[in-house]
């Protein structure tokens, strides 16, 4: 009877350890997938909309500042 009790305790410990490891792996996957924030997240954090005043690219939701105003789309630079 004692051997059965010890065996059950060992089995319970092994199962709980396995469940804990599996939970940590799932959390790591969630963290990996949530690193890149969608553009909607950038709008909520306070970036400037199209045709709003800006000084640098990082201020605009489109990530494209044309010296004074945010552009709707990041156009390729033109060589003059």
UniProtKB/Swiss-Prot annotation:
InterPro entries: Conotoxin
Modified residues (4-hydroxyproline): 76
Tissue occurrence: Expressed by the venom duct.
Highest taxon of the lineage: Eukaryota
Positions of modified residues (4-carboxyglutamate): 56, 59, 71
S-S bonds: 47-61, 54-65, 60-70
Signal peptide (UniProt feature, chain positions): 1-19
UniProt-annotated location(s): Secreted
Propeptide residue interval(s): 20-45, 78-80
Gene Ontology terms: cellular component: extracellular region
Record keywords: Cleavage on pair of basic residues, Disulfide bond, Gamma-carboxyglutamic acid, Hydroxylation, Ion channel impairing toxin, Knottin, Secreted, Signal, Toxin
Major localization class: secreted
Single annotated GO MF: ion channel inhibitor activity
Entry text on domains: The cysteine framework is VI/VII (C-C-CC-C-C). The presence of a 'disulfide through disulfide knot' structurally defines this protein as a knottin.
Family from the record: Belongs to the conotoxin O2 family.
Function description: Gamma-conotoxins may act on voltage-gated non-specific cation pacemaker channels (HCN).
Record protein name field: Gamma-conotoxin-like Am6.6
